[in-house]
Each structure stands twice: as C-alpha cells, then as structure tokens.
C-alpha cells in the first residue's frame, strides 16, 4: 500500500464538537507525521484551528457556500479535485458530507459513522453511537481512526489543545 500523504477530516457545525475532534487530528499527525492533515469547518469557527501544529490546512465553508445546495456541491467538488486524499474521515456522515466521498471514490480509506445510507460511499464505517458504548465523545471520535490500523499501529491520544496566534 502506498504511503499516506494527505488526510481530510470533515467536521462541520458546532464549536464544541469540533474542539473535541482535535484529538483525532493529533492522533493522525502522530501516527502519520509526514501526512498533511486538512480540516473542513464552517468559516465562523475556523480561526480557532488556524496555526494548530497538527492541522496543516483549514478548509472553510461560509454561509454563501453552504446555500444554495448547488454552491455547496460546487465547492466540495473543487476541494476534492484540487487535493488528492489518501484518507477521508467524515465525522458527521450526513447526506451532505458524503459528497466529499462521492467526488473521491478512488480514495482508499473513506471512513465514517454507520448510518443507514453510508454503506454506498464509505468503505469503512464505525459504530460510534451504539447504546453499548460507554466511552466519551473524544474516544468515540478516535474510533474513526481504527481502520487505519491496517496500515500501521495508530498512536492514539485523547489530548485536545487549542493554540493561540497573534491574529
């Protein structure tokens, strides 16, 4: 298998959930130190992640790029064709976020959550919402990295740190 060079993590919406996603970014950076980590977020929360040492690129969507739906699809298509990803981790796994995987079907690892409609586009689906799970949200997010253990052992970390910049 070829080396992992570029990883896309999709985590739109809430500020709290996106902060908890930093542990996944840090885990992936530790496990694949030569890979670029790209993080997709809503524009209004992106400044919290710019300059983070475990995130190489922040990709933002603003209100105008989310609606109308055609503008959203166009932006997703542009992102996916500008960057060739080896791994896509769709932390929300909604019908809207699955377009990232649709426009990148050759990506070897398209990882997300088990939902009734995700088996069409994700080749690795993780049960992070099972009623049997008693783990916290950070641990549930880290479960999304488990399929990458096929490549190498994953160095999990539950730390999530924010870094302040001068801006």
Residue ranges and their predicted role:
Residues 1-167:
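Catalytic machinery of carbohydrate-active enzymes
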